[in-house]
Amino acid sequence: MKKEFYTCKNDRAFKEVFLNPNNSDLLKALLEFILKIKIDKLEIKKTELLSGNVNIKDKRVDALVYTGNKKIDIEINSQYEKYLNPRNTAYICNTYQSYTLVGKEYNQQTDIVQVNLTWGLGAEEDIMTKYMIMSENGKLFVKNFIIYEINMDYYNKLWYSKNEDEIKKNLYMIMLDLDKKELENMPKDDIVDKYITNVTIVNDNPEFQKYMSEEEDKKKIQNSLLSEAKETGYTSGINDGISKEKVSIAKNMLNKNISIEDISDITGLSVEAIENIK
């Protein structure tokens, strides 16, 4: 059977490639391109174990990087879902809170930054959107809370446009979601060459392939359960007994280890209400 080639649109592949200490130059080049800054030194904070044990996964941020006066959380969103923005906001708020509580005083000298690499926004949407906390008149509440959402569909479209000049300008973004054959055919520099070598090594790792196969099987099972839950919710009455029915559905889904965000999206129950059910 032909094995799947996982691009860095997949968060596990991204972590295995970019959070490898030997590949800090790859992460540096990527962040410099996105943020348009010069990075002299960066420190990668491991948010979960990497190549030593690809079978261990928790619900922490995808990547956390310290550089200069910035703490950068990187999130890989392989598809756009309604729960993503609240979840990712919770992540950056947690980072902001942690930094603020540790410091000796409240100040805004360190930027708390989140970079979202998001697929599914639509190629015609803005290439990058910057979000900050401000009033409706544009007055900043704090200056060091910053979220960037990168529209990865734009870079996919750029690759298929065959515009060589634009492709060369955006290599580090485009390469993230190219398959093995496409990577062979793209323009290259030292960073691209090293990326291709490392993403290939990751995909050739039997443990990585085993982990990914198991993850895909879990997703298929979860999708089936989600469909069943939606159908049950649709046909179950939706009148006087709606609350009990929703709670029952939520309990069953919790027992199947379906994420609280998905349960909330399907049942309409708040995250807080679902947590109280537990």
Labelled PLM ranges:
Residues 2-4, 68-77, 174-278:
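Short, charged alpha-helical interaction segments and adjacent helix-coil junctions
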